């Protein structure tokens, strides 16, 4: 027999969503500001309502049952609609509004000061949490832990980071496209040589570990040419690679998006940029579309719509 929604405590659905996000009774309790015992009792009521275990204990935490997995999207959409309804009628600035972003650095570092000022001007009591874009950031967007992501994707046909391979639940907007350039310290010996592929490959390279991979489209293009670069140093992000490339006493070179010239100017790094020594077809495979990413359930969320517009405007002005 179909059960009536009027007989269900709707707070239980909030508990269910947090359990799905955290996969932990203790962590869900912390977010709800209640005891783990209270969350366990709520879970027992939910299990009785749905006549399903919903979660099973594993060494890695709570694992959702097939029924729980099938309900995840509907539950998240329902909670999002509830949040939007609560935000609508008030002509006051919402209190305690949180902005959670995952962004490639130094992209965010270039614009974060201006972006944070805009956020606080509009929402004086807002809190902002920024994390580096990483291999699990898309999942964080899907699970509601991140409002919006801002990062580069890839264009190489064999890349796993193509925009066309994004999950169906993710919406996106390409704000600008950029090519990687080569960055060398001002007195690098390569600057006294003919700038060609042989010179580019003669010196040791700094690479970044991107989404748990030490190689990217640049290495795929080189492989197609039967060539390979010597990666002497791997670092977590572009800002570290640029900082190291600018240091004296070595001949390391870095490859990073051209927009990084703004970051270098901001921090007065003594670096010189050179284009990658490839032809037009090869460079096309290296084009990086820098993309805003958010979950489809947030496409009409006023907070996310405003944030997208703010980032878009800043990109046109700063990048």
From Swiss-Prot:
Record carries keyword Transcription regulation: yes
InterPro entries (alphabetical): LysR-type_TF (IPR050389), LysR_subst-bd (IPR005119), Tscrpt_reg_HTH_LysR (IPR000847), Tscrpt_reg_YidZ (IPR023746), WH-like_DNA-bd_sf (IPR036388), WH_DNA-bd_sf (IPR036390), YidZ_PBP2 (IPR037402)
Pfam families found in the cross-reference section: HTH_1 (PF00126), LysR_substrate (PF03466)
Chain residues forming the annotated DNA-binding region: 25-44
Residue ranges of every copy of the HTH lysR-type domain listed in the record: 8-65
Top-level taxon of the source organism: Bacteria
Record keywords: DNA-binding, Transcription, Transcription regulation
Role this protein plays: Involved in anaerobic NO protection.
Family: Belongs to the LysR transcriptional regulatory family.
Name of the protein this chain belongs to: HTH-type transcriptional regulator YidZ
Gene: yidZ
């Amino acid at each position: 027999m179909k059960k009536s929604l009027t007989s269900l405590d709707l707070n239980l659905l909030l508990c269910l969503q947090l359990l799905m996000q955290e996969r932990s009774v203790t962590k869900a309790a912390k977010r709800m500001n209640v005891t783990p015992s209270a969350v366990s009792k709520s879970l027992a009521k939910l299990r009785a309502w749905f006549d399903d275990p919903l979660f099973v204990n594993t060494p890695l935490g709570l694992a959702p049952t097939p029924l729980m997995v099938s309900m995840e999207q509907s539950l998240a959409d329902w909670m999002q609609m509830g949040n939007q309804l609560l935000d609508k009628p008030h002509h006051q600035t919402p209190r305690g509004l949180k902005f959670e972003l995952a962004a490639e650095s130094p992209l965010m570092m270039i614009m974060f000061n201006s972006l944070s000022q805009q956020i606080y001007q509009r929402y004086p009591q807002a809190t902002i949490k920024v994390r580096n874009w990483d291999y699990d950031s898309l999942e964080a967007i899907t699970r509601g832990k991140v409002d919006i992501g801002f990062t580069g994707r890839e264009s190489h046909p064999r890349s796993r980071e193509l925009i066309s391979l994004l999950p169906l639940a993710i919406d996106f907007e390409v704000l600008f496209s950029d090519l990687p350039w080569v960055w060398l310290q001002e007195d690098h010996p390569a600057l006294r040589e003919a700038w060609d592929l042989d010179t580019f490959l003669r010196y040791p390279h700094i690479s970044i570990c991107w989404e748990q991979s030490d190689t990217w489209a640049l290495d795929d293009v080189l492989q197609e040419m039967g060539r390979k670069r010597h990666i002497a140093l791997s670092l977590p992000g572009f800002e570290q690679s640029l900082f190291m490339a600018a240091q004296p006493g070595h001949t390391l070179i870095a490859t990073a998006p051209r927009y990084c010239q703004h970051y270098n100017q901001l921090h007065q790094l003594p670096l010189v940029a050179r284009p990658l020594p490839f032809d037009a077809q090869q460079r096309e495979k290296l084009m990086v579309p820098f993309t805003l990413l958010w979950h489809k359930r947030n496409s009409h969320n006023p907070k996310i719509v405003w944030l997208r517009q703010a980032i878009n405007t800043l990109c046109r002005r700063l990048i």
